[in-house]
A protein has these predicted regions:
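A glycosyltransferase accessory/donor-loop signature
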Residues: 1-20, 26, 186, 191-323
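Active-site-proximal specificity loops/subdomain of glycosyltransferases
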Residues: 72-114
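Short, polar loop motifs at secondary-structure junctions
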Residues: 59-60, 85-86, 134, 360-366
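Short aromatic/hydrophobic "clamp" motif used to bind/position activated sugar donors
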Residues: 122
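Short internal beta-strands
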Residues: 52-59, 150-152, 357-362
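Hydrophobic, well-ordered beta-alpha structural blocks that scaffold small-molecule cofactor pockets
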Residues: 306-420
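Conserved donor-nucleotide/metal-binding helix-loop-beta segment in metal-dependent transferases, i.e.
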Residues: 129-162
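Short, acidic, metal-binding catalytic loop of nucleotide-sugar glycosyltransferases
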Residues: 40-49
Length: 420
């Protein structure tokens, strides 16, 4: 294993040109979950092929590195690369804004063509995936003179629905993309390195990173960089599993053609991508939950993943008990956040409570729609609703302060309760 950490250098292959080259990017906290992706990749690999696997990370610890290296068979190479120095030395005023669920590592995939120019093709995979087939087949797909191969994002088929007008507007006006239905997911990207114009690519990175209203930062940037330069393939190669696509309403809303494509990819997907905050390690209701744990049991991180699962279930039960007990009180209540937690809670307990005035959500595409029998309102409607109590159902530790400030600014006098 050649340790590339903290060296601002171009990465060179360790095998010949026929090797399968794969990059993952994550922080140390995600190492245990990545081990499941790695195990699934190993179990479905070809013993006659070589696999050059490189981890992009800025904070991975020695303990995690040692545990991951224990998993590696003879035909695999596992190396670790910190791109921080390269980025700082190459770019000035580069805006790499992080969000609640996403660390700076989410951006590192963007720099693959720049630091891996000695490769012909490189596959990037997110770490919250399970490889469910031999990945060699993906490398055999021709680029057809395109710079990357990717899969259409799960939400793209429903973008034409009236409720998603704001999402379409973001893709067209903010990102400047001509065809929103070609918007791809960044969790699986096969780069055609030899075809990418590095100078032009570098300029576009600088320009696109300055957009201040990116919803999915790395993914939005990559869609700008590779507009009209991407070959879209079957979503079997990046099947997005989450509460949305498991919901029967999703299937009833999308068109017949898109529904057929979706159901076909759902049947024995080649790569399973757990794309929402609801993951197999924090919820038993996630689609392909059993597949994830089949591989997790084989990793040296199994006990740690199991502990995370147990703690998540305890935390979830505590939130449910707290929310349930608050709803029993004779007070006018508004729920803040049309979150997956709230949807699951209302369904699970079949909640029908006249004290619930409605749900507040900042996403304007949800305004006017219903969860169960409860209408979703915008924050501007809160004063008119005039609740005694506002319960935050979005599981974010820093969310209470912003809501409290909103209440002060709008002279709203209600008790604010957080479930975190």
């Amino acid at each position: 294993m050649l340790d590339l950490l903290n060296k601002p250098m171009e990465i060179a292959p360790v095998f010949d040109k026929k090797s399968i080259n794969i990059v993952f990017s994550f922080n140390d906290e995600y190492s245990k979950f990545f081990s499941v992706a790695l195990q699934s990749l190993i179990d479905n690999s070809n013993n006659e092929k070589n696999y050059d696997v490189i981890i992009f990370s800025s904070d991975i610890k020695e303990r995690s590195i040692k545990m991951l290296l224990q998993m590696i068979p003879p035909n695999f190479s596992l190396r670790f690369y910190n791109p921080t120095n390269y980025i700082e030395n190459t770019f000035q005023n580069l805006n790499l804004e992080t969000k609640q669920y996403w660390s700076v590592e989410m951006y590192y995939r963007i720099f693959i063509p720049l630091v891996m120019q000695k490769y012909e093709r490189v596959l990037y995979l997110d770490s919250d995936i399970v490889v469910n087939s031999n990945i060699d087949e993906l490398f055999s797909i021709t680029f057809d003179n395109k710079e990357i191969i990717a899969v259409c994002d799960t939400t793209s088929p429903e973008l034409y629905l009236p409720k998603n007008s704001s999402r379409r507007e973001h893709i067209k006006k903010v990102l400047g993309l001509e065809d929103e239905t070609k918007y791809f997911n960044s969790g699986m990207l096969l780069f055609n390195i030899t075809l990418i114009d590095i100078q032009e690519y570098t300029k576009k990175i600088l320009k696109s990173s300055q957009i201040s209203t990116l919803l999915y930062p790395d993914q939005d940037i990559l869609n700008i960089l590779f507009e009209k330069r991407v070959k879209l393939i079957s979503s079997k190669w990046n099947y997005g599993s989450n509460v949305l696509v498991c919901n029967k309403n999703y299937l009833s809303e999308i068109s017949g053609t898109e529904r057929k494509k979706f159901l076909k990819s759902r049947n024995n997907p080649k790569i399973i991508h757990f794309i929402s905050p609801i993951k197999p390690w924090n919820s038993t209701g996630e689609e392909f939950y059993e597949t994830f744990w089949f591989y997790a049991r084989k990793t040296p991180f199994y006990e740690e993943i199991l502990y995370t699962m147990n703690q998540s279930q305890i935390d979830k039960a505590t939130r449910e008990i707290t929310l349930f007990s608050r709803l029993l009180r004779d007070r006018k209540i508004v729920l803040w956040g049309a979150s997956e937690f709230l949807v699951n809670f209302l369904e699970k307990y079949d909640i029908c409570n006249k004290n619930i005035l409605g749900i507040i959500d900042k996403n304007t595409s949800k305004t006017g729609t219903l969860i169960r029998n409860y209408r979703i309102y915008s924050p501007n409607d809160l004063k008119e609703l005039n609740p005694d109590e506002i319960i935050i159902t979005v599981i974010k530790s820093n969310f209470k302060k912003s809501i409290y400030n909103f209440m002060i600014e709008n002279n709203i006098n209600a008790e604010l309760i957080s479930l975190v």
